């Protein structure tokens, strides 16, 4: 009985992992948050201003943000 339960749970777990990763090619199995972050960075383009929490010592902050120069200059 215990062995049957363990086997059923193992099969369900393996099927679940297969279904989750089936949507993405083998080389692109990365976390959803990483894919979202990369997509957001690509959509920004090269840009000529620093976005929030980016350093503002080289580029000026984008409109609506201020350069906080307390410890490390970053846009807030």
From Swiss-Prot:
Propeptide segment residues: 23-48
Record key words, sorted: Disulfide bond, Knottin, Secreted, Signal, Toxin
Signal peptide: 1-22
Coiled coil: none
GO (cellular component) term, any one: extracellular region
InterPro entries recorded: Conotoxin
Database matches in Pfam families: Conotoxin
UniProt note on tissues of expression: Expressed by the venom duct.
GO terms of molecular function: ion channel inhibitor activity; toxin activity
Main location as per UniProt: secreted
Cystine connections: 49-62, 56-67, 61-75
Transmembrane segments: none
Localization per record: Secreted
Entry's free-text remark on domains: The presence of a 'disulfide through disulfide knot' structurally defines this protein as a knottin. The cysteine framework is VI/VII (C-C-CC-C-C).
Family note: Belongs to the conotoxin O1 superfamily.
Name assigned to this protein: Conotoxin Lt6.1
Organism: Conus litteratus (Lettered cone)
């Amino acid at each position: 009985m215990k062995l049957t339960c363990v086997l059923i749970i193992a099969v369900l777990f393996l099927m679940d992992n297969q279904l989750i990763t089936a949507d993405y090619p083998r080389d692109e199995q990365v976390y959803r948050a990483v894919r979202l972050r990369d997509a957001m960075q690509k959509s920004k383009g090269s840009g000529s201003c620093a976005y929030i929490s980016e350093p503002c010592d080289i580029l000026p902050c984008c409109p609506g943000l201020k350069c906080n120069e307390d410890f490390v200059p970053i846009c807030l």
